[in-house]
Amino acid sequence: WKDGLNAILDTYFGKMPEKFIYKGKEYTPHSFAESLPVKMSDFVFVTSYTHHPFYEQYIVEVPDNWMWEKAYNVPLAELMQIVDNALENNYSLGWAADVSEKGFHRTKAIGIIPEDNIESMSGTEAERWGRLSAQERAKELYSFEKPVKEKKITQEMRQEAFDNYENTDDHGMVIIGTATDQNGNPFYKVKN
């Protein structure tokens, strides 16, 4: 099967060079990888789920983890602190994400989980929301024309979505920084 796969890759990308020149220096693919200032052993896989003990490593049970890499399991609040600390110190983060949800809009380059629970809304907002039809609510939540109130994701909500296969890791992206929306709410800047 490896020969077949390599033939497909060669057809679409061209044959892998034995040697090449970059910035005036000759490399093999292996020597070029070794010349980069990136040591993969300096990077860790961190996640947050309750079906494994916190502060231990485990193999995350998702289809994209085909190399059976282990992840450090930490509480969700600590995972968010790790993300923020990395960004504050000029590190980007690889992120396995679920882009199959209706809160992800590829062409408008936004991903949100809007608050749709009327009990979490204040008086006049809840009254107005209660008068909208289901179709009007969906249009308002997913028009992506202005910031909407976002759901506060808890450890339990994250675990339930994982257990029910609602939250998957169907797409890899890179978190590169933070910004704020028109209302001053923080969000992550992500390269798709």
Where are these regions (language model features)?
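Predominantly the structural core of cysteine protease catalytic domains
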Residues: 1-178, 188, 192
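A short, structured loop/turn motif at beta-sheet edges
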Residues: 180-184
